[in-house]
Design a protein with these regions (language model features):
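Mid-to-C-terminal alpha-helical segments outside catalytic/metal-binding sites
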Residues: 85-92, 99-137
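Short, flexible micro-motifs
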Residues: 47, 97-98
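Catalytic pocket-lining loop regions of alpha/beta-barrel enzymes
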Residues: 1-92
Length: 137
């Protein structure tokens, strides 16, 4: 089963639709439902950063992150941080879309090479969906 949840960063500016579910609540959810694949909108409210902790990487094995809110929340440099963390394979574009026009994203995605862009735009989603049909957790 696959579920998309909206998450929000616990700090920073307020915006329409910003909720109160942050990284801590999202991590607890992943821990409680390890068999469920979860896409966290808004880059998981920063949850992905905790995947750099070995114990959290295990807990967050079922977590994926959507990039649709990236232009509202972060500088383009965040894509370099995601790459440095080795987590490109867990990021999706379009599961929480449309938020802005596609041109805004195209400028941001210039920070990615062709392989990374293809992963975010399609391959990661296909791999995730294929894992559901294969019964992987």
């Amino acid at each position: 089963m696959l579920l998309l949840l909206h998450t929000a960063e616990p700090v920073g500016h307020n915006y329409v639709g910003k909720g109160s579910v942050g990284p801590k609540e999202a991590a607890v959810f992943c821990s409680n439902y390890p068999e469920l694949k979860v896409i966290f909108a808004h880059l998981g409210g920063g949850l992905w950063l905790y995947e750099l902790m070995p114990e959290m990487r295990k807990i967050l094995a079922n977590a994926y992150y959507d990039l649709a809110a990236l232009p509202w929340l972060y500088e383009t440099k965040i894509l370099n941080a995601i790459k440095a963390a080795g987590l490109i394979k867990k990021f999706l574009f379009g599961s929480d879309f449309p938020i802005l026009n596609i041109q805004r994203y195209e400028k941001l995605f210039m920070a990615l090479n062709a392989e990374e862009l293809e992963a975010i735009k399609s391959c990661n989603a296909l791999n995730l969906l294929n894992s559901l049909t294969a019964g992987e957790t």
